Structure formats: structure tokens, C-alpha cells
A protein has these predicted regions:
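Short boundary segments that mark the start of a structured unit
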Residues: 1-119
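GH16 jelly-roll
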Residues: 71, 114-381
């Protein structure tokens, strides 16, 4: 993978009496993937401090660089009234998503002695809108849906390639199948709104693989399901996500030749206390070979602020990826949310949809279920 770009804020000046100050945000190199920075204004300090609401208007914004974009943008800060020497700051809320962090704070000063910082010019690419450009190869349907413990050429597996446990990930859930573990709540079933992947705290613990399991996870894995496998094209799910703390829902792709490569289309880190089920999404690629990962590139995005998208556990939303020879592009509700150069030319992938469990708690708040209303695969040459 090409090196990540480093994002920095630059100091800026504006003339007293101006109505706006422009603050540069720069990358040190062309970026191989989308870089997103959340930026806020901060009051100045000392005798010449400028204050929000008196001297300038508060700014809380997002700056997005996509592959191919110019290396400099500017943030516009409205000025109310500022006298010579007054200053305030612009700062990053956190390290930029998808890039490295350079200078994280910039000082903006009212000065008639230096040239005012100019607004950046350049042509920035508009975000793509999802479009199925391939040929429909597979569609999830109740009347043709089949599954079995290990799957087959025409059906899903209810296990993962390395079995029914993911101890190395710290998972505490056992991937269940009613045909193997009778008497449990069904881990996969068709509900009113679609296919449900159900997770649970087991009423009766299960002994499996030399360990006692207290939680049940759910998965559908296409490693042997030929119709779900493509090299280039699009995968699109429409789903409602769980919101139970400790749940770990995901839509992801794994190479048919073995892990890695891996493409995470949607991942929800519900076992992390910071995770907001309705506003956060994660997109990642895992690079490597022969069961060894040597790089992972991706982002966790607060999509409400970045793109105006939210409510993933409250209703149904679309999560998609477009795999082309040059780029991999992610979408939520048809809006491009992330893009990366494609390091996986020539690979074929199979899909996995799952809800893992990673908790030792009561696991009884909210819903631990993912409901999939639609899933389509489009193949492209």
C-alpha cells in the first residue's frame, strides 16, 4: 500500500475589518485513500485573545480529501469584529480519519502587517453516488435461501472458515446452528422484515472446543457458496443494525484463496464504550497473505457530522462497496463515505454477514439482532 498522507493545519492571517478568515488544511502527499478531519475553533489566549460570539463565529466542521484531490483546502471562519493582533485557534478534534496527524493546531491572527491568507482554489471531486454497474449475480430470497453448518456450492455456512469460535479476537460468543445445538433460540431465521441474525446470552451454557460458552453469535458465510463470489463488482446490503452493548455486527469480504485479503464493508464495534450504533460506521481493508496481516487501512466515521447520515439501529439503511481495478469505494445509503486504492487486483471474494459477541456482561440491553431486508451482488468483468 502507498504511504498514508499526513494532514496538517496551517497558521493564518486576516485583515482587521474582514468578514472571513481562511485557514489552510494541507496534505503532504497525494492520498491513496479518503482522509477526513473534524475541525473546531478555540478561543484565543492572553491580552489579544479573540472570543467566539464576539470576535468570530464558532466553526465545527469536517474537511474531506479524496484520492486525486488537490493537497490544500481552506476552512472559512466568519469574523464578527476583530482588532489588530487579536488571535484564536483552529484545532483537530482527533487524529484525522484515514491519514496521519501533522500540525494539529493553527493560530489565526488579525494583522494589517502581513498578507491575508487566501482561499484555496482547485477542483475537488464530488462524492460518488452508488450505482449497480455490474450484472445481477445473486439476490437474497426467502424461497431460495439455504444454509448448513459448513455450507455448500448453493448455500451459506453458519460457521466461519476457522470454525465456530474466534478466541483470538477476544470474542465470547459461539457461532450457533440449531441443527448442531438443539434447544437454543434460533440464530438465523426469517422474520417479518427480512432475514434475522440473532445473538443471545444462552439460557444454558454450551461446552464446545474445551471451553464453556455463555453467549451465542450468528453468521452466514459464503466461502463455499459459488453464486456469492466475485472479483470485481458491487455488494449491497439493506439492513437494520443491533444496538446492544457487546454486539459486533459486520458485513465483510474475504479472499477465496484465504485470509487476508479482507474488505470490511460495514463494521460496528459495539463492544467499545465510545461506539454510537446510530452514527458510527467503520470501513477497513486488511492486506497480507498466508494468514498473516501486515497492514490494515480504514476509518471509523461519525457519519452524521461527515455526511448527514444516521439511525442505523432505528431503521433500514444501505451499505455497499464497489470493487474496481483501481479503487474500492464504500457507500452508505448511496453516498460515498470512503475510497481506497485497490491492492487486491486479481483476487476473488466471498461475503460474510455476522453479529459477533464480545462481552462478559448481562447482554440484555436493546437489540442484539441484525435484520437483513435485501442483499444483492453484481459482477463486473
Amino acid at each position: 500500500m502507498p504511504e498514508k498522507a499526513t494532514l496538517s493545519l496551517g497558521n493564518a492571517s486576516f485583515r482587521p475589518g474582514s468578514s472571513v478568515a481562511y485557514v489552510p488544511v494541507t496534505l503532504d502527499r497525494p492520498t491513496p485513500n479518503t482522509v477526513i478531519a473534524r475541525i473546531i475553533t478555540v478561543n484565543g489566549s492572553g491580552t489579544y485573545r479573540a472570543l467566539s460570539g464576539y470576535n468570530y463565529q464558532t466553526v465545527d466542521t469536517v474537511v474531506i480529501f479524496r484520492p486525486g484531490d488537490p493537497l490544500i483546502q481552506t476552512v472559512a471562519v466568519p469574523i464578527i469584529a476583530a482588532t489588530e493582533g487579536q488571535q484564536f485557534q483552529l484545532k483537530l478534534r482527533e487524529a484525522p480519519w484515514g491519514g496521519l496527524q501533522g500540525q494539529s493546531t493553527a493560530t489565526i491572527t488579525a494583522s494589517s502587517a502581513v498578507e491575508a491568507t487566501l482561499k484555496a482554489t482547485g477542483t475537488f471531486r464530488e462524492p460518488r453516488t452508488f450505482a449497480a454497474t455490474g450484472t445481477l449475480q445473486f439476490e437474497l430470497r426467502k424461497d431460495t435461501h439455504k444454509r448448513s453448518p459448513d455450507g455448500g456450492w448453493d448455500r451459506w455456512a453458519t460457521s466461519l472458515a476457522n470454525g465456530r469460535t474466534q478466541v483470538a479476537n477476544g470474542e465470547t460468543g459461539l457461532y450457533l446452528d440449531s441443527s448442531i445445538f438443539p434447544g437454543i433460540e434460533g440464530p438465523v431465521y426469517w422474520g417479518t422484515d427480512g432475514l434475522v441474525l440473532h445473538t443471545q446470552k444462552l439460557k444454558t451454557p454450551i461446552s464446545y472446543g474445551g471451553q464453556t460458552w455463555y453467549y451465542g453469535s450468528s453468521a452466514l458465510d459464503g466461502r463455499n457458496f459459488l453464486a456469492t463470489q466475485i472479483g470485481y463488482g458491487q455488494y449491497e446490503w439493506e439492513a437494520k443494525m443491533p444496538n446492544r452493548r457487546g454486539s459486533w455486527p459486520a458485513f465483510w469480504l474475504v479472499s477465496t484463496s484465504g485470509w487476508p485479503p479482507e474488505i470490511d464493508i460495514y463494521e460496528g464495534f459495539g463492544y467499545q464504550s465510545f461506539w454510537d450504533f446510530d452514527r458510527h460506521v467503520a470501513h477497513t481493508i486488511h492486506v497480507g497473505a498466508n494468514s498473516t496481516r501486515y497492514d490494515a487501512r480504514g476509518v471509523t466515521i461519525q457519519t452524521q457530522q461527515a455526511y448527514g447520515l444516521s439511525g442505523y439501529s432505528q431503521g433500514f439503511h444501505r451499505f455497499a462497496v464497489d470493487i474496481q481495478r483501481d479503487y474500492i469505494t464504500w457507500f452508505v445509503d448511496g453516498v460515498e463515505t470512503y475510497q481506497s486504492v485497490n491492492p487486491f487486483q486479481g483476487f476473488r471474494f466471498y461475503p460474510i454477514m455476522d453479529v459477533a459477541v464480545k462481552t462478559n456482561g448481562t447482554y440484555d440491553d436493546g437489540s442484539g439482532d441484525m435484520t437483513v431486508k435485501s442483499f444483492k451482488i453484481y459482477s463486473a468483468p
